[in-house]
Amino acid sequence: MTKSMKPLKADPRSFDAFAGDYDRYAGLCDPLGEWLAGLELAGDRALDAGCGSGRHALALAGSYAEVVAADVSAPLIEVARVRRPHERIRYEVASLLDVHHAEGFDLVLSIGTLHHLPDLTAALTHLGSLVRPGGELVLVDDVSTEPAATRRQHVLFAVRELARDLRRLRVRDAWWLYRFRTGTAWLDHLMSDHYLTRAQYRARYAEVFPDADFIDLADATAMRWRRRTDDRPAHGRGPSGQRSEATDVD
């Protein structure tokens, strides 16, 4: 069994310091929105684990009767409630490890969140335990050839992206993105990020979901896994029989 990820240098609630700006950033730089829509997901109940400011939760509300959208950052949840209210969405301030539903979910979705957690296996196991029979788990996370880029590398990335952004966005939006990417709060947050390589992602996730499908995206890798209709795991146990230590919160 592979060892769990190293503990974080910073609390994932570092998003609290720039929640409003992050929402604008996500709106200008969301390469996964179109990809997610192309999956044509639908059902009764969905979970967006690590929902941020609610962009993907709002998209899910168009095809699910109930959406639970959870994030550990209270300011991000407040942004979501104000900017993306919907009668089908219930926003919750909670870690994905503290989310539970007695009947499970038809879809469990998590995008760009799992690299923030110190115990990846525990997180994967818990998310898998939330998928009801016949339901689907879709996980997407950033990958990199380097586990942790330097501050200088992040700034150089912002410089390179500025040229591309000036071609695809309004000038003021492109420059706003550059200032955000090179700002102290964002750079401090990025310095706590540690990514897996594509190969490591596949290996680590396949330990818990050996029959999953993997899709390589631009700077990320996605995993899709469906629970068999005859598979009813014991309460709190994931697809490989591993125990989830999550607290039950309905």
Which stretches of residues belong to each language-model region?
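A short glycine-rich, Lys/Arg-flanked "PGG" loop and its adjoining helix->strand segment in the class I
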Residues: 122-133
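A conserved beta-strand element that flanks and buttresses the S-adenosyl-L-methionine
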Residues: 109
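Class I SAM-dependent methyltransferase SAM/SAH-binding core
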Residues: 49, 53-98
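Short alpha-helix
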Residues: 192-210
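Short catalytic micro-motifs in class I SAM-dependent methyltransferases
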Residues: 112-113
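Conserved class I S-adenosyl-L-methionine
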Residues: 1-42, 59, 138-169
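Core SAM-dependent methyltransferase catalytic element
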Residues: 214-238, 243-250
